[in-house]
Amino acid sequence: MPITANTLYRDSFNFFKNQLLSTLTLAVLAALVTTLLGHLFIPDSEQMKLLTEAEFTFATSGKAGIQELVSQMTPEQQSMIMRAGIGTIFSSMIGSVLLVGGVLTLVAAVSAGNRISSLQAIGLSASQLPKLFLLLLICTLLIQFGLMLMLVPGIILSIALALSPVIMTAERRGVFASMKISWKLAFANIRLLVPAILLWLTARLLLVFIIDRLTFIHSEMAGIILGVFNNLISAILLIYLYRLYMLIASPQQKSI
């Protein structure tokens, strides 16, 4: 019997509905971790004042361009910019790793007939989190690089690497082995992956647009709300990808 996208969508949403509390807990936890870690790297009020003064001085000088702005900053200001940038990436990656590891472990356990909580799911995935962090970091850098070149390469890489976290979690594969298998399986089942990835990207863009219009919400609260809903959207995609992989992964494919 052929696999259809409608069947997978229905199955994924049923799972999401039945495990809503656990999935929501993981989404909130990941968003809070991202926010808290982000605050550790955000410059304090005095440092922000220095950065603002540097930006104002640069703007009134009539120059343009990021390189010129950075070159006009003091070493302390450059260090703050670098720290904030690295901190933002690091905190976002940690939140993503907790979400991906927790959701995939939860799906695997429930599919096997075991009942576990969201915290147990994170605990069971702990041994995989370092490798998962490296995998997500590499995939994110590749996809962002593709998006910077042109939009299409980034979308293609998003589709090609979509199954790699599932493969790593389900099969205990290494980073590059998971990426290689994902590449082959993704293009062999592209009709089932493209709609899901495009829906995921569209939903995230719409969410950013909606949250940005809610000006009455404090910026920090808006950031947390955006993170939670983004995580819920990603959780639905992860459930879909796990279900898809379980259906398409034959013993021959697993031995690649």
From Swiss-Prot:
It is a multi-pass membrane protein. It is found in: Cell inner membrane. GO terms for cellular component: plasma membrane. Pfam families: UPF0259. Keywords: Cell inner membrane, Cell membrane, Membrane, Transmembrane, Transmembrane helix. The chain crosses the membrane at residues 23-43, 89-109, 132-152, 192-212, 221-241. Belongs to the UPF0259 family. This is UPF0259 membrane protein plu2479. It comes from Photorhabdus laumondii subsp. laumondii (strain DSM 15139 / CIP 105565 / TT01) (Photorhabdus luminescens subsp. laumondii).
